[in-house]
């Protein structure tokens, strides 16, 4: 089964519709693949009716469906471990000392969303949904970000280029390393002591002391069946999620999944023909276009 999937919300309807229109016009009008929408809250009737009108395939809508870890659980756990007085711990992540210290440090590195509990919870929820959501029992999904626009006419069925042995089909993005990424590398070193499976010599697509390159999640095809049914992947991903790094180190879903793919040497291919634009910092235009027809790159 092949699905186009968006993690979105009612508030993002405008961006969702523009993205759907782009994907339908540039690609899906030829293949009519179904769309699946997942959100942390119920979708409104208006959201469902307007999105289903644009889709050339059928639409499915789902919500949480899985239990994700919220920031309060980590507040109480860490508070207990360092012998803080639990009676003094307020149920707000902003009042957690450890969180505040880590967030302040990350803010000094000019990172966004470091004080956003919703952002951290969303990263945790997306990864757990991909692994465990009961409605996501799909072979392959094309993960598309609300707001993304395809800039090339795509005449070939992208799913057909995905080989049985492939795990991920995407683009790469390189970013400056921050203290949270160094913490992830340390966590994986600790995991390495407990587990012998995997090549831990090179976690990222590319890395040096200052930069790391990872798989970009906002326009990628994933073999969910292979990921979900491979305990080696799920064990490492669950270990990283269980460490609380999404809250205390600002790990994103792309950080966690890319690290797992890198350690376990996932077979990956580059989406070289799929040009897209998300924002001024996130875009891609193919250098050679052997079969896509036309592009309108900025």
Swiss-Prot record:
Subcellular location: Cytoplasm; Nucleus
Keyword check for Nucleus: yes
A biological-process GO annotation: cell wall mannoprotein biosynthetic process
GO cellular component: cytoplasm; Golgi apparatus; membrane; nucleus
Superkingdom, taxonomy of origin: Eukaryota
Entry keywords, A to Z: Cytoplasm, Glycosyltransferase, Nucleus, Transferase
Principal location listed in the UniProt entry: cytoplasm
Pfam families given in the database record: Glyco_transf_15
EC numbers, comma separated: 2.4.1.-
Stored Gene3D superfamilies: Spore Coat Polysaccharide Biosynthesis Protein SpsA, Chain A (3.90.550.10)
Active site location: 220 (nucleophile)
GO MF entry, a single one: alpha-1,2-mannosyltransferase activity
InterPro entries, sorted: Glyco_trans_15, Nucleotide-diphossugar_trans
PANTHER family, per database record: ALPHA-1,2 MANNOSYLTRANSFERASE KTR1 (PTHR31121), O-GLYCOSIDE ALPHA-1,2-MANNOSYLTRANSFERASE HOMOLOG 6 (PTHR31121:SF14)
Family: Belongs to the glycosyltransferase 15 family.
Job of this protein: Probable mannosyltransferase involved in O-glycosylation of cell wall and secreted proteins.
Name recorded for this polypeptide: O-glycoside alpha-1,2-mannosyltransferase homolog 6
Organism, as annotated: Schizosaccharomyces pombe (strain 972 / ATCC 24843) (Fission yeast)
Gene expressing this chain: omh6
